[in-house]
Regions:
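A contiguous strand-loop segment
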Residues: 2-134, 154-293
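Short Pro/Gly-enriched beta-strand edge/turn motifs at strand-loop
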Residues: 60-66, 152, 334-342
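Glycine-rich, aromatic-lined ligand/substrate-binding cores of catalytic
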Residues: 231-363
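Substrate-recognition/cap regions that form aromatic- and gly/pro-loop-enriched pockets
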Residues: 324-325, 329-454
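Histidine-centered catalytic/metal-binding microenvironments
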Residues: 432-490
Length: 490
């Protein structure tokens, strides 16, 4: 999916949490209704078959309960997207990435091949299943991962065994670490730990720009990779580091150069998004003019950076809702020209389906540590709401999305608000901002108050109280969302 991701290490976040956030965007001309769901062990398949690639995978018998944000309309797969399991391991999948012709030749993607002819007749060729894709990954990995590193290993093993039919980036988190995995061709992959004091910005482009093969093949302190990556790179001459001998890659190399792309479309669709996110979080750098450190079309914008100050939930929401505010590229702005205002793909667009921010708080007890902040619809007009993840059910307002358009659930109410406010952006702006600030403030107070309330409860009683708190807060959000819908309608 055409998404945008930001990852924030624990020492770079405002409260010591690991933070994983990603927009899921629908493709042009298509909208996929979304809902919240808790998947229980008895609901997890033991034999899984992908709808798109027809791949069948046998799964372990010991899945954990986990949260997810699946598609509503049946027929093309689950697309669980983001969530936490019972051990407070988070996963967000996927960020669709780009690659290049050398990689596709060296390790072709594993596409589904339909059957030819009729079974039982001469010349019949049976269908060949494809590999894994975004449709599958959360369902196949999150119920079994015991840590962020373990999630990387599980998915890495699946990729090496079954392959993939698309290029993807996947985030895993626990209370101590965030790992980012990028698929390389059909069966190869690399993963890097997000530095604790840094954030990572990811548009739809292969991002990791420095990788230590020795660490990945040894201690794996900060890097992991597919088993034969070094030999495969050497065979296909994929490392582009100057001065490296032709028979092998450098111990430390740049994967973005080796495996990624620098196409003209990247400079419209991808690099501008990374440029603007980092502009917001490191504003003292030079971002404009002939002496700019980076421009919207720079190919060397860093994968990770230390921010100028600690990053908040609101910072994440702002950058993942952004449309180049304050620049000549703002599609809602008055600076520049019509050409500049339409030059680059914004992050906050009408095709945003959902935004999940996965927060793991080290100061909270494990029973209520995981908070999944959620927003639906266009991020320029919606608000994040917090949900405790250690629960058996989700509030109906978030979970009961149907294909039918209605104002009675959070997804469609936000879609309606976005459609109405988009064409009257400036007239509706004040009402939208008031709603976002009020709901955000309500959310932070809710978490503070419920943390205190459940801290004195026996652990066995905590999930039920968290579910009750989620439900009560959802009703308050419903009131505020209905009020905003009325304001933008009039």
């Amino acid at each position: 999916m055409p998404c945008t991701t930001i990852l924030v290490g624990k020492n770079a976040s405002y409260d010591g949490s690991t933070l994983v956030a990603r927009n899921e965007d629908s493709s042009n001309g298509v909208f996929e209704p979304k809902r919240m769901r808790v998947v229980h062990p008895d609901e997890q398949p033991r034999v899984y078959t992908s709808v798109l690639s027809h791949l069948t995978v046998e799964l372990p018998d010991n899945p954990m309960r986990y949260t997810s944000v699946p598609d509503v309309v049946p027929g093309h797969g689950i697309w669980a997207e983001a969530g936490f399991n019972e051990l407070n391991v988070g996963m967000s999948a996927t960020e669709t990435l780009t690659t290049n012709e050398r990689v596709r030749g060296a390790d072709p993607l594993v596409d589904y091949v339909p059957a030819k002819g009729n079974e039982g007749e001469d010349g019949y060729v049976p269908a060949q299943p494809g590999g894994l894709g975004e449709e599958d990954m959360v369902t196949l990995v999150l119920p079994y991962a015991k840590s962020a590193r373990d999630g990387v290993r599980i998915l890495g093993d699946l990729l090496e065994r079954y392959g993939t039919y698309e290029n993807n980036g996947i985030a895993f988190s626990d209370v101590d670490e965030i790992w980012w995995l990028e698929t390389i061709g059909g069966h190869h992959w690399i993963a890097k730990r997000v530095p604790d004091d840094a954030y990572v910005t990811m548009p739809n482009q292969l991002g990791i720009d420095s990788f230590d093969l020795d660490d990945a093949e040894g201690a794996q302190a900060d890097h992991m990779c597919s088993a034969d990556l070094r030999a495969w790179m050497a065979e296909w001459h994929l490392d582009l580091t100057l001065g490296v001998e032709g028979d092998g890659p450098a111990a430390v190399f740049n994967p973005r150069e080796a495996f990624g792309s620098h196409s003209d479309s990247d400079h419209v669709y991808n690099t501008p998004r990374a440029w603007y996110m980092q502009r917001c979080l490191n504003p003292s750098d030079v971002w404009d003019g002939p002496d700019a450190d980076y421009t919207p079309e720079s190919d060397d914008i860093p994968w990770s950076r230390v921010p100028e100050r600690k990053v908040t939930i609101e910072d994440i929401k702002y950058v993942l809702s952004s449309h180049y505010q304050g620049t000549e590229y703002d599609c809602y702005g008055s600076k520049g020209t019509p050409a500049t205002r339409g030059a680059y793909r914004p992050i906050g667009i009408n095709r945003n389906s959902q935004l999940a921010v996965l927060q793991l708080r080290p100061y909270a007890q494990p029973a209520y540590r995981a908070v999944q902040w959620m927003a639906f619809g266009s991020n320029s007009f919606n608000a994040l709401v917090p949900l405790y993840a250690n629960v058996e059910t989700m509030p109906e307002y978030y979970a009961d999305t149907q294909a039918r358009v209605t104002s009675e659930n959070f997804y469609w109410a936000n879609r309606l608000i976005g459609a109405l406010a988009d064409v009257r952006f400036h007239e509706c702006g004040r009402a939208v901002e008031d709603y976002q600030e009020k709901v955000g403030g309500m959310g932070h107070k809710q978490i503070h108050d419920i943390d205190a309330a459940v801290a004195v409860l026996p652990e066995a009683e905590v999930p039920a109280e968290l579910a009750r708190a989620n439900e009560e807060f959802a009703e308050r959000v419903r009131v505020e969302t209905d009020a905003l819908l009325g304001k933008v309608l009039y």
